[in-house]
């Protein structure tokens, strides 16, 4: 009889011990799935590339150009001496260093016409485009022609406006520069449109391409992204209302 009672107590004790172990395991498992870690002062944020193009007509008031901004007049009547100029600067509005280049639009449209001699022509073949850094608005068209004389070239799709990639750190902006398009006074009747078939050009604009620059450092140096794939932010400013 005593032996049976002892066995019964042992079984009950063992069962209680097993239940306690199970309860502890359940509690531990619950803790694994609900445990959290947080910091009160650190914010983890992915770097972003954000390039903006600012434009001005007077070097005083600046506006952000969008894809709908028209920087040049599509309705211009191009003739010898006629000049259009816009002042630009590129801004790094992101939190990563970037490098950019600027070029003339690939997507402008040129329609051929007939000149007063009856010959076919395209007006863009007689237009010049050039750039110049400037801190003030040019006083007259002659000053524009003189400033861009060293780098002007015939208007063409994707003409580069920068000689190389230019690096901007976060929050930094480029020096202001002028982009001018004009018809030289030396052009004659070869681009003098007949009333019936004038040549026209539309969609004149600027394209800015940017990619990440090798500036930020990790625990070793600033070359961690030197072999990263080149991803371009490409923004074109051609259409809309100026």
Model-derived features: positions:
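Surface-exposed, hydrophilic segments of mature proteins
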Residues: 2-5, 36-242
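Membrane engagement elements in two modes
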Residues: 2-46
């Amino acid at each position: 009889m005593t032996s049976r009672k002892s066995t019964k107590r042992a079984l009950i004790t063992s069962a209680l011990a097993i239940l306690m172990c199970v309860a502890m395991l359940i509690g531990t498992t619950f803790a694994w799935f609900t445990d959290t870690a947080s910091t009160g002062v650190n914010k983890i944020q992915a770097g972003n590339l954000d390039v903006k193009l600012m434009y001005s007509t007077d070097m005083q008031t600046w506006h952000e150009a969008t894809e709908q901004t028209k920087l040049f007049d599509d309705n211009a009547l191009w003739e010898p001496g006629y000049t259009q100029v816009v002042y630009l600067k590129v801004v790094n509005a992101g939190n990563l260093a970037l490098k950019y280049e600027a070029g003339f639009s690939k997507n402008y449209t040129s329609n051929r016409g007939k000149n007063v001699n009856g010959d076919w022509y395209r007006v863009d073949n007689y237009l010049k485009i050039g750039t110049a850094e400037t801190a003030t608005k040019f006083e007259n068209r002659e000053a524009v022609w003189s400033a861009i004389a060293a780098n002007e070239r015939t208007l063409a799709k994707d003409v580069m406006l920068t000689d190389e990639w230019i690096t901007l750190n976060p929050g930094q902006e480029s020096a202001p520069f002028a982009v001018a398009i004009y018809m030289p006074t030396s052009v004659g009747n070869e681009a003098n449109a007949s009333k019936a078939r004038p040549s026209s050009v539309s969609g004149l604009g600027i394209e800015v391409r940017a990619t990440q620059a090798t500036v930020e450092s990790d625990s070793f140096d600033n070359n961690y992204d030197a072999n990263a794939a080149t991803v371009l932010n490409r923004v074109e400013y051609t259409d809309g209302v100026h």
